[in-house]
UniProtKB/Swiss-Prot annotation:
Residues 34-51, 113-130 have a biased composition (Low complexity). InterPro entries: AflR (IPR013700), OAF3 (IPR050675), Zn2-C6_fun-type_DNA-bd_sf (IPR036864), Zn2Cys6_DnaBD (IPR001138). It comes from Passalora fulva (Tomato leaf mold). The keyword Transcription applies. One of its GO terms (cellular component) is nucleus. Residues 15-24 have a biased composition (Pro residues). GO terms for biological process: aflatoxin biosynthetic process. Gene3D superfamilies: Zn(2)-C6 fungal-type DNA-binding domain (4.10.240.10). GO terms for molecular function: DNA binding; DNA-binding transcription factor activity, RNA polymerase II-specific; zinc ion binding. Keywords: DNA-binding, Metal-binding, Nucleus, Transcription, Transcription regulation, Zinc. Induction: Expression is positively regulated by the transcriptional regulator wor1. Expression is down-regulated during biotrophic growth within tomato leaves. The keyword Phosphoprotein does not apply. This is Cladofulvin biosynthesis regulatory protein claE. SMART domains: GAL4.
Length: 446
């Protein structure tokens, strides 16, 4: 038996595979240096065995059959007895390859993949994200701070002073919208198709609402978003939205000045520059303008309807302020105006809607005039409620037809908008009733 083994060993010599060269690592740590020193001092045989690939102790046939192998080379006893092919394969170790330096998992994650282009040295993450956005949208995007500042800069750059200056009391008292009345010719010029003639629309609003947008901004949005924006774009095209926004800006600036007057009673003399005649005249003009907008075809836009409601709240607030501005005289008191007031207004007669506001009972006539002016506001609220009813019905019909079902957000916006519209109508009616009750009580006390 030993003779056959020696003969087999002579015909089939077992040669170890050539050693794999170990690459020199720049920095491997103390453990790798100690291992390399021990390998070099152990001799040539131990170095070749440790460095070379290892062979499995059992053959492939026995390992596949889950049987114990005799581990004889080149063929085990079981394979010789059954006439099977006996093959010893290399041992596959899990983990890193032998001779490769250790690298942290964090450094491996930062390495770029072989399939994608690696960014050149010196390129920051901003430029890399810019390239990704360029591949996504097909147009070069400038993500630097300078490019953002250049994109935001325009001839109509927004400044806080553009709106804060209007809130000052001096601008309020010098505003021609609340000092001088508008005649019929100016009223028709407001209602024309030119949005720039609407009570002096500010340049910022002209730029934001009147200039057409580029098609690239609309190409990014989907069909559902474009459908939801259709009514708003139609409202802008006929300038009704610009007119309502201009009215809202004027009333907001004036309301801020009124709040300043209520906090500082010493500003009462400056507030008197704004006469009751001018306030009532401009409120009537605004009510006529809003009534015409509600009758226009572009009022199918929900944004426009909401802005009409907000301006109506402002009008009711100014009627309430005018009704409460003059103090109620106690029994036995007599209203004696100052001499300066008599000198300034001795030759002036204030007449609105056939009511003469001068004389001893001027306060009562003013309150009666305000009570009469509330009737056009009530008609405006009725038109507003009718427009809301038609708008909600159109939205519900569009939802049933499947037009708004293309976008998942459309159904949520439908229910939300319906609730908002109903709440606006309820609040307008409640505010009008409360103001009418206060005016009637004030009239009884005079």
């Amino acid at each position: 038996m030993s003779l056959s083994r020696s003969v087999a060993a002579m015909h089939f010599p077992v040669t170890a595979p050539p050693p794999v060269p170990v690459p020199h690592a720049p920095h491997t740590g103390g453990l790798h240096e100690a291992t390399a020193t021990a390998s070099s001092s152990a001799g040539p045989t131990s170095t070749s065995i440790a460095a070379g690939p290892r062979v499995r102790s059992s053959c492939e046939t026995c390992a596949a059959s889950k049987l114990k192998c005799s581990k004889e080379r080149p063929r085990c006893a079981r394979c010789v007895k059954r006439g099977l092919d006996c093959t010893y394969v290399l041992l596959k170790r899990a983990g890193r390859k032998p001779g490769q330096p250790q690298t942290s998992s964090r450094s491996r994650r930062r390495e770029p993949s072989s399939g994608g282009p690696s960014p050149p040295s010196g390129v920051t993450g901003t430029s890399t994200s810019s390239d990704m956005l360029q591949d996504l949208f097909g147009t070069p995007l400038d993500m630097t701070v300078d490019g953002f500042d250049a994109a935001m800069s325009d001839s109509s750059t927004f400044h806080s002073s553009d709106l804060l200056d209007d809130h000052s009391l001096s601008a309020f008292t010098a505003d021609p919208f609340f000092i001088h009345g508008l005649d019929d010719q100016q009223l028709h010029s407001i209602c024309d198709d030119d949005p720039h003639s609407m009570l002096g629309v500010p340049p910022l609003m002209n730029h934001a609402l009147m200039e057409p947008r580029t098609p690239r901004a609309l190409s990014i949005s989907d069909n559902g978003s474009q459908h939801l924006r259709t009514g708003r774009l139609d409202g802008v095209s006929c300038s009704c939205l610009a007119r309502v926004l201009s009215l809202f800006q004027r009333y907001s600036a004036s309301s801020e000045s009124l709040c300043m007057h209520q906090r500082k009673p010493e500003l009462d003399e400056r507030l008197e520059n704004v006469s009751t005649q001018s306030i009532l005249s401009q409120n009537g003009t605004a009510v006529e303008l809003l009534s015409g907008i509600l009758e226009s075809p572009c009022c199918q836009d929900g944004y426009l309807v909401v802005m009409v409601a907000l301006v109506t709240f402002k009008i009711l607030g100014w009627y309430s302020a005018v009704a409460q501005r003059t103090k109620t005289l106690l029994p036995g008191e007599r209203h004696n105006p100052s001499p300066s007031f008599d000198e300034q207004h001795s030759n002036t007669t204030t007449t609105i809607r056939g009511f003469c506001l001068d004389g001893e009972d001027s306060e009562r006539r003013t309150v009666q005039l305000i009570l009469g002016e509330l009737h056009p506001v009530r008609q405006l609220i009725e038109r507003f409620a009718l427009r809301l009813k038609l708008l909600v019905e159109e939205m519900q019909d569009a939802d049933k037809a499947g037009v708004a079902a293309k976008d998942l957000c459309a159904n949520a916006m439908l229910s939300t908008s319906t609730l908002v519209y109903k709440q606006l109508e309820t609040d307008l009616r409640s505010e009008w009733r409360a103001l009418s009750a206060r005016v009637i009580d004030r009239l009884k006390n005079l």
